[in-house]
């Protein structure tokens, strides 16, 4: 079984080797730029870890793991545009390097690419994987809209906030684990347990993230916040 660090190295190498050879370059250069920014790669590593619980050779899951990371970065690209953020991981955001329209269109392309990568899995698991991935993508949109709605309210209840972070953050971590388990041949019970674990982990991460955003010294905690 591989360590998390070993799996991180593997998926980083795989993503670094991606070639976007289609044209126009004005669409695909921002995609390559976003993926070159790095990051913790938590979601693909979780998928590989879950798969590795059941299968030794993790290479068959590189494409779906790449899909989950491309999807995550697509959401960040559009988040940065909506928030008018100038920096992401210490580098200028896509709408600053290029423009708003390019950020929208390249983000859309990343969403399609994420589905293409995710679909590169064995036929016997394709429907279950794509159903879960599609539901997760929709739930993330719902969570983002809730977050935007809450910015206009001063009466947000605790249960509403928890539901928002479940949708906005937790479901993708949970899906990463469950997809890895399904592809590895896990039982339905095991896959669901890993999903629940990912859900709880995501809530814990987002609670910490939000606390640091409110109370943390950015100079000290920048490397800790955001997953």
Where in this protein do the model-derived segments appear?
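Mg2+-dependent prenyl diphosphate-binding active-site environment of isoprenoid biosynthetic enzymes
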Residues: 16, 20-225
């Amino acid at each position: 079984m591989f360590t998390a660090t070993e799996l991180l190295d593997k998926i980083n190498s795989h993503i670094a080797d991606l070639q976007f050879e289609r044209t126009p370059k004005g669409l695909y250069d921002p995609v390559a730029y976003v993926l070159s920014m790095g990051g913790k790669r938590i979601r693909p590593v979780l998928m590989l870890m879950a798969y590795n619980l059941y299968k030794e050779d993790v290479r068959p899951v590189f494409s779906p793991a790449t899909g989950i990371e491309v999807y995550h970065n697509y959401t960040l690209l559009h988040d940065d545009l909506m928030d008018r953020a100038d920096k992401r991981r210490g580098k200028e955001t896509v709408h600053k390097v290029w423009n708003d329209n390019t950020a929208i269109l390249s983000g859309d392309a990343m969403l399609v690419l994420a589905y293409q990568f995710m679909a590169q899995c064995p036929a016997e698991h394709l429907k279950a994987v794509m159903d879960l991935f599609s539901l997760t993508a929709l739930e993330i949109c719902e969570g983002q809209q809730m977050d935007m709605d809450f910015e206009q309210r001063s009466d947000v209840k605790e249960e509403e906030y928890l539901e928002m972070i479940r949708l906005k953050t937790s479901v993708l971590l949970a899906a990463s684990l469950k997809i890895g388990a399904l592809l590895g041949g896990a039982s339905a019970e095991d896959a669901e347990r890993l999903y629940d674990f990912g859900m709880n982990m995501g809530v814990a991460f987002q609670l910490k993230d939000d606390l640091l955003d409110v109370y943390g010294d950015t100079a000290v905690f920048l490397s800790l916040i955001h997953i």
